[in-house]
From Swiss-Prot:
Keywords: Amino-acid biosynthesis, Cytoplasm, Isopeptide bond, Methionine biosynthesis, Phosphoprotein, Pyridoxal phosphate, Transferase, Ubl conjugation. Its EC number is 2.5.1.47, 2.5.1.49. It comes from Saccharomyces cerevisiae (strain ATCC 204508 / S288c) (Baker's yeast). PROSITE patterns: CYS_MET_METAB_PP (PS00868). There is a cross-link at residue 160 (Glycyl lysine isopeptide (Lys-Gly) (interchain with G-Cter in ubiquitin)). This is Homocysteine/cysteine synthase. The modification Phosphoserine is found at residue 44. Belongs to the trans-sulfuration enzymes family. PANTHER family: HOMOCYSTEINE/CYSTEINE SYNTHASE, HOMOCYSTEINE_CYSTEINE SYNTHASE. GO terms for molecular function: cysteine synthase activity; O-acetylhomoserine aminocarboxypropyltransferase activity; O-acetylhomoserine sulfhydrylase activity; pyridoxal phosphate binding.
């Protein structure tokens, strides 16, 4: 099997296309709920996980399996599981590790939806999220205890764009027998970063973003590195070392070895909680994967050019992008990111003279710049082929209090830009006309 990313994104999971019933070169859409057993014995064997095959599409589907194998290959993982959304991927990834009374340790530099999920929803499940402000490896270790079941990071923090020191954090976590879970959404399916290469144990994605790439489909992925030694920690992770109450006494460590985790998540959590990815979504995401490297390359190139242009603009007070030497995590970005520095940046606009921003916060120059863009779309997504903008303080992080917003790196003047693959001069021209419209001849 070819190993280059550009080839893997086209062929992994479908190395022998002639194997399907009608020799279709495109991945077929298996729009079926269920699969016919050869006989009763065969059905029994499938339900007992004694032979490979398909039972019911809430557990497994041939179209989705191609997507799973392809993303696992691109990430350098052993296996993957496709689910209904990025939030579902995070939920199952953590619930496969932590139970009532357990805790996870996470950076505070998070997407607002993740922060809220960890802080509120996981608490209802009896799982405590302990937030470390920033990504200093030593700060994580300070809050570990015997019930810590995972460390959680984002490859490129949203919206601060910090790049954690993976190797140091992984070393500290593994010293305590704790697996590391990394949301690699901003790593674009492994194009900008492969966290498993640096020791991460489990990778999650909102496949909605760069993997799909066209703003058409919601989906999530969990990738298992297959490298964490679950057998070495039977008391810490009894769900793998003891007979499974929910699957006729199966001991996952014995039955599935290095794949114990991902099989457990599929056969029990996906089965019981139900956030499956439907085959139509898998098919659409596969269309995106086939051009992933081509799009991601352009996203990265355009983002760097726009960031450098914004740095020189008289209307801009600051720019945050890990590809800039001025960024606090630039050295980590150079170490851990490849093929570019990602497709998203943030910046702040200088104050508008005489704006009544205390009475009406939407009079802030940043909000007005967003409202006056014509090419870029003001919406809550990233990773689309088209340029997208948003003011996170008023939207994606709105549910956080002011202290939590600051801890996440969100300020009132922040504009987040998911840079598209349009011609860069057109993107720049759109921001320039918006600046000129908002300031209308006034000096910033």
């Amino acid at each position: 099997m070819p190993s280059h990313f550009d080839t893997v994104q086209l062929h992994a999971g479908q190395e022998n296309p002639g194997d399907n019933a009608h020799r279709s070169r495109a991945v077929p859409i298996y729009a079926t709920t269920s699969y016919v057993f050869e006989n009763s014995k065969h059905g029994s064997q499938l339900f007992g996980l004694e032979v490979p095959g398909y039972v019911y599409s809430r557990f497994q589907n041939p179209t989705s399996n191609v997507l799973e194998e392809r993303i696992a290959a691109l990430e350098g993982g052993a296996a993957a599981l496709a689910v209904s959304s990025g939030q579902a991927a995070q939920t199952l990834a953590i619930q496969g590790l932590a139970h009532t009374g357990d805790n996870i340790v996470s950076t505070s530099y998070l997407y607002g939806g993740t922060y809220n999920q960890f802080k509120i929803s996981f608490k209802r499940f009896g799982i405590e999220a302990r937030f470390v402000e920033g990504d200093n490896p030593e700060e994580f270790e300070k809050v570990f205890d015997e019930r810590t079941k995972a460390v959680y990071l984002e490859t490129i923090g949203n919206p601060k764009y910090n790049v954690p020191d993976f190797e140091k954090i992984v070393a500290i976590a593994h010293k305590h027998g704790i697996p590391v879970v990394v949301d690699n959404t901003f790593g674009a399916g492994g194009y900008f970063c492969q966290p498993i290469k640096y020791g991460a144990d489990i990778v999650t994605h909102s496949a909605t973003k760069w993997i799909g790439g066209h703003g058409t489909t919601i989906g999530g992925i969990i990738v298992d590195s297959g490298k964490f030694p679950w057998k070495d920690y039977p008391e810490k992770f009894p769900q793998f070392s003891q007979p499974a109450e929910g699957y006729h006494g199966t001991i996952y460590n014995e039955a599935y070895g290095n794949l114990a985790y991902i099989v457990h998540v599929r056969t029990e959590l996906l089965r019981d909680l139900g956030p499956l990815m439907n085959p139509f979504a898998s098919f659409l995401l596969l269309q995106g994967v086939e051009t992933l490297s081509l799009r991601a390359e352009r996203h990265g190139e355009n983002a760097l050019k726009l960031a450098k242009w914004l740095e020189q603009s008289p209307y801009v007070s600051w720019v945050s992008y890990p590809g800039l030497a001025s960024h606090s995590h630039h050295e980590n970005a150079k170490k851990y990111l490849s093929n570019g520095f990602g497709g998203v940046l943030s910046f702040g606009v200088k104050d508008l003279p005489n704006a009544d921003k205390e009475t009406d916060p939407f009079k802030l120059s940043g909000a007005q710049v967003v409202d006056n863009l014509k090419l870029a779309s003001n919406l809550a997504n990233v990773g689309d082929a088209k340029t997208l903008v948003i003011a996170p303080y008023f939207t994606t992080h709105k549910q956080l209090n002011d202290k939590e917003k600051l801890a996440s790196g969100v300020t009132k003047d922040l504009i987040r830009v998911s840079v598209g693959i349009e011609f860069i001069d057109d993107i720049i021209a759109d921001f320039q006309q918006s600046f000129e419209t908002v300031f209308a001849g006034q000096k910033p």
